[in-house]
């Protein structure tokens, strides 16, 4: 009798993706983050669904409805904090996943990488709109500041902003449409993730050496299913430590004040996972220039495959490139710190230097380092 796992039309797809999938025998824990992102997405969709059952997207009642969820709904507080901190875990996994791709040269799978960049942008858009929904001070002013950036677009800017707002300021229409988009986008992300996986399985996974591993493959189950379960346990442990012990650690106290258009908070800043891009935006004195730098700080990832000059795929055996990579990581941490600081000396100049460094490392230093390493290979 043939195995149903291998013959049933639906089971066959699952089998070929998660059970009998040939995987390299030497992939490290850095390859766990793809499955962890899937878990994060499922968790966010489920908690978000239960929150949407009790949330009202009206400016008069949005803040109160979130308070109601935390106070009156059975386990509403844990669902709300799992959703809020789940977003943070999502972005930690995303940054690790992208970092892994950069370090080990996974960006040479062009289709997979480009879908990944689109996924990153979509997730950032979703998270931004979700932050607006509780309708606290930082929600309102964050929405105002970030949507207002579109007014920097020549000629159509102002019309575009008012079209997105649905009026002349961030108001009821804006909140309602942001809720609608925030609800639908995770399902689009899920669909894109499947396409991401489809393209990945066309080529098979990369591995730490960057050398083709066709000669040495092992089945995904049980080896990597067990490994992924370990990663999932650690992810859930970290999330629950955050949720149950310090649920507001990563939030902003200003968001516990209902939105007030007449009172601007002293420091408007987004959630921690956007601070690096926010720092780059603020570093440029010109509005349009800042917006372009902000967009390019993410879209530059799409250029990385074109900037690959090395004869080797992975950075595993390239010490100079490794140095550049870790300097880039340190630079991103610096930008994240600067994004949360007020706009005053010495933070302004540090932010400007870190922003220049960010683009300089990716566009100049990494290709140069690769070329030097290529020449060192010929050195006798």
Swiss-Prot record:
Coiled coil: none annotated. Pfam families: Cytochrom_B_C, Cytochrome_B. Heme b b566 binds at residues 97, 196. Heme b b562 binds at residues 83, 182. Disulfide bonds: none annotated. Binds 2 heme b groups non-covalently. It is found in: Mitochondrion inner membrane. Its main location: mitochondrion. Its cofactor is heme b. Keywords: Electron transport, Heme, Iron, Membrane, Metal-binding, Mitochondrion, Mitochondrion inner membrane, Respiratory chain, Transmembrane, Transmembrane helix, Transport, Ubiquinone. GO terms for cellular component: mitochondrial inner membrane; respiratory chain complex III. GO terms for molecular function: metal ion binding; ubiquinol-cytochrome-c reductase activity. It is a multi-pass membrane protein. It comes from the Eukaryota. The chain crosses the membrane at residues 33-53, 77-98, 113-133, 178-198, 226-246, 288-308, 320-340, 347-367. A ubiquinone binds at residue 201. Component of the ubiquinol-cytochrome c reductase complex (complex III or cytochrome b-c1 complex) that is part of the mitochondrial respiratory chain. The b-c1 complex mediates electron transfer from ubiquinol to cytochrome c. Contributes to the generation of a proton gradient across the mitochondrial membrane that is then used for ATP synthesis. The cytochrome bc1 complex contains 11 subunits: 3 respiratory subunits (MT-CYB, CYC1 and UQCRFS1), 2 core proteins (UQCRC1 and UQCRC2) and 6 low-molecular weight proteins (UQCRH/QCR6, UQCRB/QCR7, UQCRQ/QCR8, UQCR10/QCR9, UQCR11/QCR10 and a cleavage product of UQCRFS1). This cytochrome bc1 complex then forms a dimer. This is Cytochrome b. It comes from Rupicapra rupicapra. The gene is MT-CYB.
